Design a protein with these regions (language model features):
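Short beta-strands within extracellular/lumenal beta-sheet-rich domains
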Residues: 142-154
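Short structured motifs
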Residues: 133-137, 148-150, 193-197
Length: 246
């Protein structure tokens, strides 16, 4: 009897293992998981198309409405190369005509080498503009890229002694009305108010904010807002792209 038990127990264990393997194989074949490439990509829920109505900053003063250009290929295996000189050289290279002055329309296209890239007028769902999700959702390159961003901030009056506060992943430079305001170099994570500009003046009416963000491997995003002398966010601004390009 003991001999039969010693023989039967291992056999039963083997049969039990085989039964589980067959069960799980049948389960997987009945409901195969969709491969990543089979899943339709979208920029939702991170972005939605900007409307013609002026948009105020969010509750903390962050600018969420931007014209974003699809990413320009700029291969980099590491973000450690993003020194002052490297980043400035990358952004001073002319990839498309009037890149430092153009105020595009939604849907405008530019030619960069063999890339045809479009501008998109979008509202970010978050305080930080998720460039990686923007590129991924449009089936564009996500690593080793440069993003250009433009927005138009309308001020109800002249505002003196304000500061532009920005954070980005990875390196970036930001301009206000054609003048460089802040620069962020090296391999860095996106941190709120990571770098703050010197005191500057917002004109009554239209002010053009322009930025360029470069990244190698990893996620890309940025956040931008204006703060006053006390470091408090300036909220009585609006962003409107309905006159972009005019």
């Amino acid at each position: 009897m003991n001999l039969l038990r010693k023989i039967a127990m291992p056999v039963m264990r083997i049969l039990l293992v085989l039964a589980f393997q067959i069960f799980f194989a049948a389960l997987c074949s009945a409901a195969p998981a969709a491969a990543p490439d089979d899943v339709p990509r979208s920029i939702a829920p991170y972005f939605k198309t900007a409307t013609s109505s002026p948009k105020a900053p969010d509750a903390d003063g962050f600018l969420q409405r931007w014209l974003l250009l699809e990413p320009i290929n700029k291969p980099n295996r590491s973000n450690t190369v993003f020194t002052d000189s490297y980043v400035r050289n990358a952004f001073n290279t002319e990839y498309f005509p009037n890149q430092s002055t153009v105020i595009p329309h939604d849907g405008d296209k530019v030619k960069v080498g063999d890339q045809e890239l479009a501008w998109h007028a979008l509202d970010s769902a978050n305080f930080n503009v998720k460039l990686f999700r923007f590129a991924y959702g449009l089936n564009k390159p996500t690593y080793g890229v440069i993003f250009w961003a433009v927005t138009i901030v309308n001020s109800p009056r002249e505002m003196q002694n304000v500061r532009l506060a920005a954070g980005s992943n990875s390196a970036s430079i930001w301009w206000v009305n054609g003048q460089e305001a802040v620069d962020l170099f090296d391999d860095r994570r996106m941190v709120m108010d990571d770098v703050v500009s010197k005191r500057l003046t917002l004109h009554r009416g239209r002010n053009v904010i322009r930025g360029a963000v470069i990244n190698g491997p990893g996620l890309s995003d940025f956040c931008v807002r204006f703060i006053d002398e006390n470091g408090d966010p300036i909220k009585d601004l609006t962003v409107s792209l309905d006159n972009a390009g005019k």
